[in-house]
Amino acid sequence: MGLCASSEKNGSTPDTQTASAGSDNVGKAKVPPKQEPQKTVRTVNTANQQEKQQQRQQQPSPHNVKDRKEQNGSINNAISPTATANTSGSQQINIDSALRDRSSNVAAQPSLSDASSGSNDKELKVLLLGAGESGKSTVLQQLKILHQNGFSEQEIKEYIPLIYQNLLEIGRNLIQARTRFNVNLEPECELTQQDLSRTMSYEMPNNYTGQFPEDIAGVISTLWALPSTQDLVNGPNASKFYLMDSTPYFMENFTRITSPNYRPTQQDILRSRQMTSGIFDTVIDMGSDIKMHIYDVGGQRSERKKWIHCFDNVTLVIFCVSLSEYDQTLMEDKNQNRFQESLVLFDNIVNSRWFARTSVVLFLNKIDLFAEKLSKVPMENYFPDYTGGSDINKAAKYILWRFVQLNRANLSIYPHVTQATDTSNIRLVFAAIKETILENTLKDSGVLQ
């Protein structure tokens, strides 16, 4: 089910601004002060839109997850979702069968051309926002797979240099982390300091699509397999240095990727990482006469000054948050907690005058990585008011609450737990988003009350 969170209007609606960094933010996200309940939560009943009614619920206490009341399952339904985490036998977030049912009902909805006069196609402007590495570009790649017949052979080939750069970046980050924490090479290790220095200084030729250099591949592969490296990336210092989220995936597939005649798979492309710079407009035909102009903009601080250029006439904002970032700091500012940065950004977006009449879809992304991390890195270390332990449902609901309670502008917020690298998950999520757009358009046109 979708969830609309609303609150009373606040006179102050700040425009989007760069989140400030401070030493007090290191490692922990700030806990909001306790306030009088003022929000209402209403559950959207898409099965019977003619009988829809608003159901109100008091804002849960911020100090104890266990004490939060979930009237009519409003928050719980938003979390039961949209994604199933592969947790290797541990807890899993349950799939909401009702969400599957509602995605199948989309075809039965009246088309937008029936609800509006003029053009047969309804063109919608959608902004894809969020901090760096929250999964925005991966979501856009999934939409290309789902609605634009995927990647051409030429496009697949063009991803080879990027994936090679990702492998090289992994090697360099491992070497830098070992140096920072004074991790010496094992006595029996065949690598030398010269090997590490050569890897650090190696420059991949531009647009290179041949075989990955064998000598550099040997260094990275050997380095990753060292017990001291594994202790470092899985130990208490893991959150203190940067390592791209897809590192385990790429190292698991390292031999295949560095072999002759390498051709990237769809999953290789989805797992690749490239910082978005600039503004990219992608047109997606969603069916039912809906065309979505999706604007993907860079999430790093240096890119956010460009956001203002695409704020006019926005129908929908999709805001991406990485669930697994709760113990991480920004790549561009090692003193700023990533989760705190996302909260500040979300606050500025939902309470901005630019989006006073805009709906917001909140993607709580990377549920798979979140499930793996939760049992290793207690959330209580970063959120003193969280008491849900390693229960993934309680943890996800807590994070959702932290975002929803910022909605002073009374916007409609539709949260989804997502795994952007899972095509079937994103297909299901966008079926639900499409239905939300249909419903809102029909209401605006007077077809629905």
Swiss-Prot record:
Domain (G-alpha) ranges: 122-448
Annotated segments matching region G3 motif: 292-301
Low complexity bias locations: 49-59
Self-association state and partner proteins as the record states: G proteins are composed of 3 units; alpha, beta and gamma. The alpha chain contains the guanine nucleotide binding site. GPA2 interacts with the kelch repeat beta-mimic proteins GPB1 and GPB2 and with the gamma subunit GPG1. Interacts with the G protein coupled receptor GPR1. Also interacts with regulators of G protein signaling (RGS) protein RGS2.
SUPFAM superfamilies documented for this protein: P-loop containing nucleoside triphosphate hydrolases (SSF52540), Transducin (alpha subunit), insertion domain (SSF47895)
Region (G4 motif): 361-368
Region annotation Disordered: where it falls in the sequence: 1-91
Subcellular compartments: Cell membrane
Region: G2 motif, residue numbers: 268-276
Post-translational modification summary for this protein: Myristoylation at Gly-2 and palmitoylation at Cys-4 are required for membrane localization and function of the protein.
Provenance organism: Saccharomyces cerevisiae (strain ATCC 204508 / S288c) (Baker's yeast)
Residues where lipid is bound covalently (S-palmitoyl cysteine): 4
Function field: Alpha subunit of the heterotrimeric guanine nucleotide-binding protein (G protein) involved in glucose-induced cAMP signaling. Binds to its cognate transmembrane receptor GPR1, which senses extracellular carbon sources, and activates cAMP-PKA signaling and governs diploid pseudohyphal differentiation and haploid invasive growth. The G protein beta-mimic proteins GPB1 and GPB2 inhibit GPA2-GPR1 coupling, probably to reduce signaling in the absence of glucose.
Result after altering residue 6 to A: Abolishes both palmitoylation and N-myristoylation
Key words, A-Z: Cell membrane, GTP-binding, Hydrolase, Lipoprotein, Magnesium, Membrane, Metal-binding, Myristate, Nucleotide-binding, Palmitate, Transducer
Note from the entry: Present with 4570 molecules/cell in log phase SD medium.
Comp. bias intervals (Polar residues): 7-23, 38-48, 72-91
Molecular function GO terms recorded: G protein-coupled receptor binding; G-protein beta/gamma-subunit complex binding; GTP binding; GTPase activity; metal ion binding
Annotated stretches, region: G5 motif: 418-423
Lipid-linked residues (N-myristoyl glycine): 2
Gene Ontology biological process terms in this record: adenylate cyclase-activating G protein-coupled receptor signaling pathway; ascospore formation; glucose mediated signaling pathway; hexose mediated signaling; invasive growth in response to glucose limitation; pseudohyphal growth; regulation of cell size; signal transduction
Regulation: Alternates between an inactive form bound to GDP and an active form bound to GTP. Activated by the G protein coupled receptor (GPCR) GPR1, which serves as a guanine nucleotide-exchange factor (GEF), and inactivated by RGS2, acting as a GTPase-activating protein (GAP) for GPA2.
CDD domains: G-alpha (cd00066)
Annotated gene: GPA2
Protein name per Swiss-Prot or TrEMBL: Guanine nucleotide-binding protein alpha-2 subunit
InterPro entries reported for this sequence: Fungi_Gprotein_alpha, Gprotein_alpha_su, GproteinA_insert, P-loop_NTPase
